Swiss-Prot record:
Species per Swiss-Prot/TrEMBL record: Arabidopsis thaliana (Mouse-ear cress)
Name assigned to this protein: Dynamin-related protein 3A
Quaternary structure, from the entry: Homooligomer. Interacts with ARC5 on peroxisomes and ELM1 on mitochondria.
InterPro entries cross-referenced by the UniProt entry: Dynamin, Dynamin_GTPase, Dynamin_GTPase_CS, Dynamin_N, Dynamin_stalk, G_DYNAMIN_dom, GED, GED_dom
CDD domains, per database record: DLP_1
Superkingdom of origin: Eukaryota
Keywords, sorted A to Z: Cell cycle, Cell division, GTP-binding, Hydrolase, Mitochondrion, Motor protein, Nucleotide-binding, Peroxisome, Peroxisome biogenesis
PROSITE patterns cross-referenced by the UniProt entry: G_DYNAMIN_1, G_DYNAMIN_2, GED
Amino acid sequence: MTIEEVSGETPPSTPPSSSTPSPSSSTTNAAPLGSSVIPIVNKLQDIFAQLGSQSTIALPQVVVVGSQSSGKSSVLEALVGRDFLPRGNDICTRRPLVLQLLQTKSRANGGSDDEWGEFRHLPETRFYDFSEIRREIEAETNRLVGENKGVADTQIRLKISSPNVLNITLVDLPGITKVPVGDQPSDIEARIRTMILSYIKQDTCLILAVTPANTDLANSDALQIASIVDPDGHRTIGVITKLDIMDKGTDARKLLLGNVVPLRLGYVGVVNRCQEDILLNRTVKEALLAEEKFFRSHPVYHGLADRLGVPQLAKKLNQILVQHIKVLLPDLKSRISNALVATAKEHQSYGELTESRAGQGALLLNFLSKYCEAYSSLLEGKSEEMSTSELSGGARIHYIFQSIFVKSLEEVDPCEDLTDDDIRTAIQNATGPRSALFVPDVPFEVLVRRQISRLLDPSLQCARFIFEELIKISHRCMMNELQRFPVLRKRMDEVIGDFLREGLEPSEAMIGDIIDMEMDYINTSHPNFIGGTKAVEAAMHQVKSSRIPHPVARPKDTVEPDRTSSSTSQVKSRSFLGRQANGIVTDQGVVSADAEKAQPAANASDTRWGIPSIFRGGDTRAVTKDSLLNKPFSEAVEDMSHNLSMIYLKEPPAVLRPTETHSEQEAVEIQITKLLLRSYYDIVRKNIEDSVPKAIMHFLVNHTKRELHNVFIKKLYRENLFEEMLQEPDEIAVKRKRTQETLHVLQQAYRTLDELPLEADSVSAGMSKHQELLTSSKYSTSSSYSASPSTTRRSRRAGDQHQNGYGF
């Protein structure tokens, strides 16, 4: 059976016969399966080949893999029907060969010019002599990798047009070798495996795994490397070669049925030309006849007709590839469309070269205007490139105001750093040498001003945070576009940095003025201020609730003093102590009011209030005026009396502090002061939380939005700076050229896909057929490899397979 029989019908005048059709049977004009789909993909491959390794679009293709001398080249030549590949005992395929088989119509004269080959590196040359094609492959390989068995991953692209082939595209890769020869590196096996994996790892790739029948299939290099990327065997087709040289008594039936290593797409067995056939110049067509004769003479292979022979392999590859392409077409078109949009956008960012001054001025003005618009859009949250994964632009400014600045101020307790002794000291210092009947205003104002001044640093820090955010926003604007002009980018960064610093100064000055205004006028008439009466009531309540009374045990022989006398004594004592430096004492000690209560009432009535009363001792007696006037005694008595009247004071220390113990009245005064501080601090804090963001927005943020464009025009729009600022680095010119080429290729590819006829657009049908292929049981048909009428009809009706699925 020949390829011609598979691809078309015999003339109607030829009746069905049980004899084998002759190899010269002509093809009909019926379009073979995938007559338009595969050529379109071939055209896409040629288009994307212009980009070389830069292409990121993976196209559907069939990749041939196998170990060295496994028969890959023989299979490819059998599919073409001509000798055209380099041959030898050593490695022959040293560069990937992309082989596009294109079926053409047979000419009436049947001349030798019906078949020809074209290399992509020689687009204007047609090779009608296939031996010349072999020599060109060898020459092109040697031009790149030398003549001493080196390998490379640069493709050789060959298109063969012939009426005797089916539309198939295959990629022949170097065979897997174990031992380096010639100038091959020591890691030649790893390099070849890496090259193979780079092709077959794509889901768009079908794998044609070639394994000789005289080796163990479980140890097949081709199947092993295919299983790495296709472990389930969904896109791997097995080819068993050299069936004619298996040991006597053995056959490949179990292998072909998939009983050893199952593959979803099945196996095909073929017979290769031996070295003797090549030496005797036997043609491929003669080898196909010999292959057919071999399978006829082996009854073990009867019933496996659809799994035997090169013609069946060609038909199977054609059908699987067509349906594979149809399944992938929607995604392929989508990927090309997305790549086209992305490349067009990138190319647009590089712009066009402008050499005239007028053009340069217009270009610069356009850049400055777009930059200011992008800057404002980021601040206002209207940018199209706004991130969805994090806060950016103006949202970060709002976060700094509310979640950092305001929250930090609200967490501050104005009395946190003030102890009760600090407040008591401030109160006593404010009274001077006098005793205060009420809590004085001065200590409250001093303490509240001190707390207000603490708000200056966080307010200035907030302004600095906003300044840094504005700098970050300026760096994010038009990042890709300004990569084209690094000098302009640098100048713009300098201008906007200086401009923002100029806006930061009045912002900080205004913040300082706001704090100064709050400190200069303490408005105790504010409606939200707690006020004196409420503060006293709250303080009394807090003091009473915090103190638990403890009864004092009195001695049994102590006479309870008169309540009126005791009360009067307490008032006098308090008044006196108030007059004595407001209760500030040194280490001499203080006589408390309780000590006065312990004195008898008679002594209290006879004793005068004065300095001696502070230092009451156990043996000390009061010296009256009459005793001083009585002088009947001797001089010694007078000296003793004089000495008794002398009171020596210790000098006060350098640092004076209030006493550690304080009265209930002092506790109330401290609580009142704290309440007043907290109440007024809350008022000022709210004012600062409102005024500081307003000052920053006015003097820094909004001022930048309003005036940035004018500043750019003033600083940068100068004719003598045009050429310097619009100078491009060399890499930009290279990128512009590369993206322009890529854009042209993608546009060609997109137009090529639009040329697909209705056959290629039947995606749903193609997908269903592809699923049918994966689950088909037709691989196990019982028809024999013979010239039975049923087999002949199936061969002749290959053109109907387009409508009836795969029909293997």
